[in-house]
């Protein structure tokens, strides 16, 4: 990479929350950010509100709930002629109040379609672009969550149920109506979200296992802390949106601001101390600025290699890669 050429990072869901503040933090580090979002007007307004220079970011449309939209994004990105030096899979939908599943254009339950299938396809398609990066340290980073890791307290909470892919029978059967859960069981909206994030963490680990040694690309997940006032919770009950941030700030002490979470994400993307691949970074779910990062142990639901391999194969089939 030429000395005067900025490295380029694609961030999904960069119009608000952690993705937006990660974009800001990476721009400060000298990166050019491709803000991959559904609402480009919203993304542009948000970037300007944080003082990001118009030449420091590029807006590109993507709807991760549509596999066709993901493919169109990849085509548009390649036509732009930009290098790809890092990919941050941040966007997510969380719809805990649904009684019946919403469906993607392909007929898949929407939270799994958006959070897992969309990012799974994006990662696989852009892997070739990352391989050709001239940056000395290309990385692919996926946002994880405490609720998908049963090694942590947040991952044990049975509301509505802990993350668990079961025997993957829902994927095995094609994951279309009436099926709406990866394990093939009755629909539970909150669990569908947790399962999708568990898939994200498995995907990152599989990417590392399959491609790190041959490409040098760093594949990691992170949990930047409990961002209790993130727009992710916009589809929750209004009382939850008011009480949850207060509870995390005043009772658990686990609250982390959107800005600090974005800064932590940028660290994992760009800073040299995060070059280790195949791990899950955490800060112990605390706001404290000086808190040290550490590699968080993951549960057997993530580290089961046989199930991970099968989940990968089924996901390839369902997104049209196999």
Swiss-Prot record:
Q: What EC number(s) is this enzyme filed under?
A: 1.3.1.33
Identify a single GO molecular function assigned to this protein.
protochlorophyllide reductase activity
GO terms (BP aspect): chlorophyll biosynthetic process; photosynthesis
Enzyme class, first EC level, given as a word: oxidoreductase
User: Which keywords does the record carry?
Assistant: Chlorophyll biosynthesis, NADP, Oxidoreductase, Photosynthesis
The pathway this protein participates in, as annotated, is:
Porphyrin-containing compound metabolism; chlorophyll biosynthesis
Per the record, what are the reactions this protein catalyses?
A: chlorophyllide a + NADP(+) = protochlorophyllide a + NADPH + H(+)
SS bond list: none
The family classification in the record reads: Belongs to the short-chain dehydrogenases/reductases (SDR) family. POR subfamily.
The record describes the protein's role as:
Phototransformation of protochlorophyllide (Pchlide) to chlorophyllide (Chlide).
Its protein name is: Light-dependent protochlorophyllide reductase
Q: What is the lineage of its organism?
A: Bacteria, Bacillati, Cyanobacteriota, Cyanophyceae, Leptolyngbyales
Gene of this entry: por
């Amino acid at each position: 990479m030429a000395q005067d050429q900025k490295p380029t990072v694609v961030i999904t869901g960069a119009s608000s929350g952690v993705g937006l503040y990660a974009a800001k933090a990476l721009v400060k580090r000298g990166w050019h950010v491709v803000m991959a979002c559904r609402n480009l007007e919203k993304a542009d307004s948000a970037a300007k509100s944080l003082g990001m220079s118009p030449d420091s970011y590029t807006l590109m449309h993507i709807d991760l709930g549509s596999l066709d939209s993901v493919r169109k994004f990849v085509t548009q990105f390649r036509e732009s002629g930009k290098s790809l030096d890092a990919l941050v899979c941040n966007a997510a939908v969380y719809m805990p109040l649904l009684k019946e599943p919403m469906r993607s254009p392909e007929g898949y339950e929407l939270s799994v379609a958006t959070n897992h299938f969309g990012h799974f396809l994006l990662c696989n398609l852009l892997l070739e672009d990352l391989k050709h990066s001239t940056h000395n340290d290309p990385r692919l980073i996926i946002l994880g969550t405490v609720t998908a890791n049963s090694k942590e307290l947040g991952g044990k909470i049975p509301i509505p149920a802990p993350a668990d892919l079961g025997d993957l029978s829902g994927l095995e059967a094609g994951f279309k109506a009436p099926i709406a859960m990866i394990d093939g069981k009755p629909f539970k909206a909150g669990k569908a979200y947790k399962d999708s994030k568990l898939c994200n963490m498995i995907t990152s680990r599989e990417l590392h296992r399959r491609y790190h040694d041959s490409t040098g690309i760093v594949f990691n997940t992170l949990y930047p802390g409990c961002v209790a006032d993130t727009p992710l919770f916009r589809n929750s009950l209004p009382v939850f949106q008011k009480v949850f941030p207060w509870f995390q700030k005043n009772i658990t002490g686990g609250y982390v601001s959107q800005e600090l979470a974005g800064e932590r994400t940028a660290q994992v993307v760009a800073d040299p101390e995060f070059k280790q691949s195949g791990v899950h970074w955490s800060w112990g779910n605390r706001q404290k600025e000086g808190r040290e990062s550490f590699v968080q142990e993951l549960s057997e639901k993530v580290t089961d290699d046989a199930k991970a391999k099968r989940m990968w194969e089924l996901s390839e089939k369902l997104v049209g890669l196999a």
